[in-house]
Amino acid sequence: MQPLTLPPLPQLWVGYLLGLATVVAELIEGSNHASDPPPTDFPIPNLYLFLLMFVGAVYWLVCVYRYHVVMGHIPGWKHPISPARAVGFHFIPIYNLYWVFKWPQEIARFVNWRFAQPVMKPQMVGLMVFAAFVMRFLFDPGLGLILLFLAASYVSGCLRRAFALPPMPPKNPPPPTE
């Protein structure tokens, strides 16, 4: 029997590097503008900081897309979320708050089915992603980006462990989708 070849999982080190670069850019930005802006002014980041924040957000969406590409190529598994849908629903206001809990739940369904016990906790991923978005938009974009990729590291780790298991026997079909 030939080993299972799936598309590769996302390279998360790129996200961590972008997060670290964003934190460094924030520190440089802060040291260049030591005085506080007037409370009526909206702080506008420098171009290099904005580009790092933008590229970090885009790379996060690339990683989400990649997870769902991998899930769609698993033999015997019908993943209910297309890669485009997984990314697209992040842009719908209010619904995206639900979505960051929903797509990890579907990946956890696969992981828990492969282990035949609840190994992956999708609520934890959803809470980490939600906390990362709050951190990213209200407090610190760089640390928020690093927190996003910590959540992705948990997902990748669970998927790697599930892929390392021997193939499932045909008598144990996957659970139906909701």
Spans of features found by a protein language model:
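Membrane-interface extramembranous regions at the lipid-water interface
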Residues: M1-P45, L52-F91, Y95-V134, L150-E178
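Extracellular/periplasmic helix-loop-helix junctions in multi-pass membrane proteins
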Residues: V134-L147
